[in-house]
């Protein structure tokens, strides 16, 4: 049997990015044949990726890229906040954001099929899963292409904003993007707030007003007032500017001779149900299963 040297392990690790112990095991199994060991590792990493691919990804990052007249915002998910800080994961997320901006894929499936590093985006993603041992997924993206200006803002890589705007001052775009990250509006103006959100708010207001015991006409006014207040709170233009509580965003934009055409806001894991492991329940289930054997 061929002797497995440290230099052989290092060479295999450099080629595959696999953990040192995995490289040594593969070389041992391949009797020192580097090419065969590399093939074995790729199979093992693929299997590892397959096992991880079914696990919930509620952590992750938001990445952005702006180049020329296009900009993109992407959300990539992983399983733990530890991996969300991994250099390889972060580098992959930035690459994906750039691909979205420059290649204009129609959806996540089209993005995954784009060429990358001599393979495809999805193949690189699977290799990353094999390397870090956690599921990694590209959840969503948005792309703006415009003759206007584009600003982006990332808050700790967990909140991301992209804004299309007009105006001479770039600081305006940065300020608006930062404000959106802080105040999380759901629409540009009151007229843009989705009808289902308004209906929900109206039902809640009606239930609260009905409990007041006041006359119907007063109740109706209370409901309308609550809905109008809600619309102001969740529409960007009506919100109070976080850097100047004497101005609304609309007033700030007017003073700067600027306008906002549209924006997108991503919050990592938004809407994903994160698995909460119950250790006691897991042990109880294992004990019960053992008794049935």
Swiss-Prot record:
Keywords: Cytoplasm, Elongation factor, Protein biosynthesis. GO terms for cellular component: cytoplasm. Pfam families: EF_TS. Its main location: cytoplasm. InterPro entries: EF-Ts_dimer_sf, Transl_elong_EFTs/EF1B, Transl_elong_EFTs/EF1B_dimer, Transl_elong_Ts_CS, UBA-like_sf. It is found in: Cytoplasm. Transmembrane segments: none annotated. This is Elongation factor Ts. The lineage of its organism: Bacteria, Pseudomonadati, Pseudomonadota, Betaproteobacteria, Burkholderiales.
């Amino acid at each position: 049997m061929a002797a497995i040297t440290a230099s052989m392990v290092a060479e295999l690790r450099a080629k595959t990015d696999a953990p040192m112990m995995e490289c040594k095991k593969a070389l041992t199994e391949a009797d020192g044949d580097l090419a065969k060991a590399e093939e074995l590792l790729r199979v093992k990493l693929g299997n590892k990726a397959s096992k991880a691919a079914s696990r919930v990804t509620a952590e992750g990052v938001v990445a952005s890229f702006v180049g020329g007249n296009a900009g993109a915002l992407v959300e990539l998910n992983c399983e733990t906040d530890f991996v969300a800080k991994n250099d390889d994961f972060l580098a992959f997320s930035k690459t994906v954001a750039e691909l979205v901006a420059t290649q204009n894929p129609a959806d996540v499936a089209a993005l995954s099929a784009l060429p990358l590093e001599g393979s495809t985006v999805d193949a690189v993603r699977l290799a990353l899963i094999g390397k870090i041992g956690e599921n990694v997924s590209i959840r969503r993206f948005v792309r703006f292409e415009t003759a206007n200006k584009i600003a982006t803002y990332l808050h700790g890589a967990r909140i991301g904003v992209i804004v299309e705007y007009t105006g001479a001052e770039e600081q305006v775009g940065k300020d608006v993007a930062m404000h959106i990250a802080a105040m999380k509006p759901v629409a540009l103006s009151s007229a843009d707030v989705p009808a289902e959100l308004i209906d929900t708010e109206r039902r809640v207001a009606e239930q609260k007003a009905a409990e007041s015991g006041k006359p119907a006409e007063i109740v109706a006014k209370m409901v309308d007032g609550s809905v109008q207040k809600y619309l102001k709170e969740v529409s960007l233009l009506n919100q109070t500017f976080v850097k100047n509580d004497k101005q609304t965003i609309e007033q700030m934009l007017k003073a700067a001779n600027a306008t906002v055409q549209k924006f997108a806001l991503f919050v990592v894991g938004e809407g994903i149900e994160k698995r909460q492991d119950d250790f006691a329940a897991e042990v109880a289930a294992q004990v019960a299963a053992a008794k049935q054997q």
